[in-house]
Amino acid sequence: MINAVLKTPALSSWTEKANFFGARKLPFVFLIDFEAGNAEIFTFHEALEKGIRWSFPDGHRSVPVPQHPPAIQLEKYPISLEEYDQKFQQVMSALQYGDSFLTNLTVSTPIKTNLGLLDIYRFANAPFKVYWPDKFVVFSPERFVKIQSGKIYTYPMKGTIKDEKGAEQLLSNIKEQEEKATVVDLMRNDLAMNSRDVQVERFRYAEAIQTDRGKIWQTSSKISGRLPSFFHEKIGSIIASMLPAGSISGAPKKRTVEIIQESEGEPRGWYTGVCGYYDGADLDSAVMIRFIEKTDKGLVFRSGGGITAKSTADQEYQEMIDKIYVPVY
C-alpha cells in the first residue's frame, strides 16, 4: 500500500481484492468506512443480492429512479450549542498548538421523517446515492475520485452558505478561501502519490444544491493527474492510499484523524467513508456525506464542517444544522 494513513486488516484485504479485480478488468462495487474497519467489495450481482442500490451521475444505477416524489416531513433534534462548543474547543486547542491546520468536525443529530430509507434513496435529488438495507442511505453531492481514459480526477468540496447570502459571499469569505486552499493542496499531494502531471484545473467554483427548504451553496475544486498505463492492477492501492478523503478529515491527515477521534467521541463508521464502482475500464466514487443512519434509537443524520483557526463555534454550529436536509422536492 502506498503511504496509507489508514492501515487496517480490512483495508489490506480490500486492496488485494480490488487489485485482483482491476488486473482482470472485472467490474465491482465498493464501500469503505471512515476508519477502514469495514471495507466491502462486491460484484454487481452480489451487491444487488444484498439489497444494495446505487445511482451515479453518468447514468450508472442499479434500478430506475422513479418520478413524482411525495411531500417530505423532516424534524431534527440537534445537540445544543453548548454541547457542540465542547467538541469545537477541543479542535480549536489542537489547531492553536499547530497539530492541525484544518479539522473536519461532525456530530450526530436524531431526526424524524415520514419517509423510509429506501424512499429517500428513490426520491432524493443528488448526483451520488447509495442505499444499504437496515443500515443507511447516502445522497451525496461530492465526488471523491473519478478515473477515466487514463486520468484521475478529484473534486474536494468545502464551504457552505445559505442561498439568501449568495455564492459571491461564500467565494469572498477569507476563512473559506484558506480552508479550500488547504484541502486543494492536500488532495493535490494525494494525487501526486499515484499520478504525474498533477494540476489544479479549477481552484474554486460555487455550486447550488437544492434542498427541501431552499438552496444552499457549496464550493468545489477540480484536480487531475495522469495515471500509468498499468493502473488497473493497482486500482485498489490507488484508492486506499488516498483514504480518508481530505475534505472530510483535514491536514495534516494522520494527526488530524486522531484529533477527530478524540473530539467527536464516537466512530463515524460508514459516514464520510467512500463508495463507488469500477466497470472494467473506468472508476467513479463519492464521499459518503449527507448521510442518514438507522440505529437502535431511530434515524440519525450525520453532518459537520471544516474548522480552522478563524472559525467560530456559532457559525460552525449553524452550518452543521444547515446541512441536515433531504433533497426531495
Task: Mark where each language-model region is.
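Extended alpha-helical targeting/anchoring segments
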Residues: 1-329
